[in-house]
């Protein structure tokens, strides 16, 4: 960075904190996209997906997003266990893959961002507070709120918009349900 060191609550934010926040922020989308990609790209993973086309992709993406965020819900068409006798379905063979990948997504999605947040908190707690100066960016101002919401929306859009373009957006534009 060029210029002044940023501050938050009177504590200087340095490169270590920025890296930890980046890990905590980007970790969830990376786990979701890798898990959904493996489910779609591998034969065992495809057995877990009942619906084809954009609906099947949306179900897979939603399942891993939910599991990585520790909710664990899924659309009814995800995992072969839910529709064992449906035409073209391989029965319950894909359940093991879906269960193992879902459990791994939950495990990774829960602890890595938590550890990153705790590391940032510990790093900031160890620092001495700096006195507020004339250039201090106040956290109780409307501009802080606008910038915070803007960054959240931009990071979320950049993380999932390409994947959403393959699923729900295509489904909505083509009116193709299955």
What is each PLM-predicted segment?
Residues 101-108, 154-157:
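Hydrophobic alpha-helical transmembrane segments of multi-pass membrane proteins
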Residues 74-77, 81-87, 91, 128-161:
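Internal helix-turn-beta structural module
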Residues 25-38, 118-122, 147-160:
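Hydrophobic core segments of alpha-helical transmembrane domains in multi-pass membrane transport
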Residues 28-36, 55-66, 107-126:
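Hydrophobic alpha-helical segments of multi-pass membrane transport proteins
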Residues 38-42, 113-126, 157-174:
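Membrane-helix cytosolic exit motif
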Residues 13-28, 139-151:
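Alpha-helical transmembrane segments and their helix-start/interface "positive-inside/aromatic belt" motifs
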Residues 46-105, 163-178:
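P-loop potassium selectivity filter motif centered on the GYG triad
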Residues 1-14, 119-139:
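Alpha-helical transmembrane segments
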């Amino acid at each position: 960075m060029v210029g002044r060191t940023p501050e938050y609550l009177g504590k200087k934010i340095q490169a270590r904190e920025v890296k930890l926040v980046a890990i905590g922020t980007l970790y969830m989308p990376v786990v979701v996209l890798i898990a959904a990609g493996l489910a779609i790209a591998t034969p065992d993973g495809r057995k877990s997906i009942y619906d084809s086309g954009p609906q099947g992709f949306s179900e897979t993406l939603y399942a891993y997003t939910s599991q990585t965020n520790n909710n664990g819900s899924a659309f009814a068409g995800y995992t072969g266990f839910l529709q064992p006798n449906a035409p073209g379905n391989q029965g319950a063979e894909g359940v093991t893959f879906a269960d193992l990948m879902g459990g791994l997504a939950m495990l990774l999605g829960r602890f890595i961002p938590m550890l990153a947040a705790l590391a940032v908190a510990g790093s900031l707690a160890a620092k001495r507070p700096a006195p507020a100066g004339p250039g201090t960016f106040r956290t109780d101002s409307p501009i802080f709120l606008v910038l915070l919401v803007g960054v959240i929306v931009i990071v979320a859009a950049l993380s999932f918009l390409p994947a959403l373009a393959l699923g729900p957006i295509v489904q909505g534009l083509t009116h193709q349900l299955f």
